[in-house]
A protein has these predicted regions:
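N-terminal beta1-alpha1 cap of cysteine-dependent amidohydrolase-like domains
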Residues: 1-129, 137-145, 149-197, 203, ...
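The feature captures the ABC ATPase H-loop/switch
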Residues: 133
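Active-site-proximal beta-strand elements of phosphoester/diester hydrolases
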Residues: 236-239
Length: 295
C-alpha cells in the first residue's frame, strides 16, 4: 500500500520525487516604510538578488510587538538590511541640525537594532546595503556625517577638480564612481580586484568607524564605502547598491550571504531555540534600541 503522503508521481507509480535542495536558506529582508502612505516598500532588485543566488527572501514586518520577531528570527538563516531613509541622528549622539534629513522611522530602526544584536550574538550572516551599512556602523558604536555635501570634502584625491557625485542623477544600474578595495578584506578577496565601479545613492556616510568594524573599501574622496566585522563569519556592509549589478560582477556578494546562511543553518549556529526579546514587563531584554559604544 502506498503512503498517502507520498509525492504525486510516486502515487502514480513513477519514481520518487527528488528534491535537490529541500531547504533554501531563508533571508529576512528589512523593507522601507512610507509613513505618509502607511505602507511598506521594497524594490524588486533586492528580491531578485537573493533568489538568483538560491536564497528564499522573506520581507519582515515593522511592528512594536517584539513577540513577532521572537517567532520569526529563529526561522531566518541570514539577514539583509536595505537602503532607505536617514537614521535618526540621536542614535549616534549627534545634536547637529540637518535640514535635509528624512522623517525618522522608529519601528524600522528598532527592527534593525534587534537584527544586529541577534546576528552578533548568534553569528547570523548579515549584509547591510547603503543605509543598512550605516546602521551597522551606528549600532556598533560609529557615527555618520549627516550630510556629505555640507560636512565632507567631496573631491577625487586623484583629480581634485572633479567632485564626487554620491547621489547620482543617472540610472541606478549605471556606475558613477570607483571604490578602492582592501585586497586582504573578505570583500576584496571575493571580488578579486583593486578598483570597482559602483553606483551611489546617498547623502550620508561613515564619519567615525565602529571599533568592531574594519574598512573594506574607500571612495575616491576617502569616504569609507564598505565595512566588515573580523570576528564574525559574515557581517558586511557596502555603501553602494550591488543589487543592481547582482547578475553581473557583484553577484558574488549575494552568493556569499546565501552560502554562509546555508552553512550557518547546517552547523547549528542559527538557533531554533525559543527566543525572548522582551521581558515579562514588556521592556527590551537586550536593551538594543539605545545605541552604545560597547556591545
Amino acid at each position: 500500500m502506498q503512503d498517502p503522503a507520498a509525492a504525486p508521481a510516486q502515487q502514480a507509480g513513477g519514481a520518487p520525487a527528488r528534491i535537490a535542495n529541500p531547504h533554501l536558506p531563508i533571508i529576512g529582508i528589512v523593507p522601507s516604510a512610507e509613513l505618509e502612505e502607511n505602507r511598506l516598500v521594497l524594490r524588486n532588485p533586492y528580491i531578485d538578488a537573493i533568489t538568483s543566488c538560491g536564497g528564499a527572501p522573506v520581507i519582515l514586518p515593522l511592528t512594536a510587538d517584539k513577540r513577532v520577531y521572537e517567532s520569526l528570527f529563529p526561522l531566518m538563516d541570514g539577514f539583509l538590511l536595505t537602503g532607505g531613509a536617514d537614521i535618526s541622528p540621536e542614535r549616534y549622539y549627534s545634536t547637529e541640525h540637518n535640514p535635509k534629513k528624512d522623517t525618522p522611522t522608529p519601528l524600522r530602526e528598532e527592527l534593525e537594532c534587534l537584527i544586529l544584536s541577534y546576528a552578533y550574538k548568534f553569528d547570523v550572516p548579515t549584509l547591510g546595503i547603503c543605509r543598512g551599512m550605516q546602521m551597522m556602523n551606528v549600532f556598533f558604536g560609529g557615527t555618520l556625517y549627516q550630510d556629505l555635501y555640507d560636512q565632507f570634502p567631496l573631491h577625487d584625491d586623484d583629480e581634485p577638480e572633479q567632485p564626487i557625485q554620491h547621489w547620482q542623477q543617472d540610472d541606478w544600474s549605471n556606475p558613477s564612481h570607483f571604490v578602492r578595495l582592501i585586497r586582504d578584506s573578505k570583500l576584496g578577496e571575493m571580488l578579486d580586484m583593486e578598483r570597482l565601479a559602483t553606483n551611489s545613492m546617498h547623502h550620508q556616510g561613515v564619519k567615525e568607524l565602529s571599533p568592531l568594524l574594519k574598512p573594506a573599501a574607500y571612495g575616491p574622496d576617502g569616504l569609507v564605502e564598505a565595512v566588515e566585522m573580523p570576528n564574525r563569519t559574515f557581517m558586511m556592509g557596502v555603501q553602494w547598491h550591488p543589487e543592481y549589478f547582482a547578475r553581473k560582477n557583484m553577484k558574488c556578494i549575494f552568493t556569499a550571504l546565501v552560502n554562509e546562511a546555508a552553512a550557518a543553518r547546517r552547523s547549528g549556529r542559527v538557533t531554533m531555540d525559543p527566543l525572548r526579546l522582551v521581558r515579562d514587563d514588556g521592556s527590551n531584554r537586550w536593551n538594543v534600541c539605545r545605541y552604545r559604544r560597547n556591545v
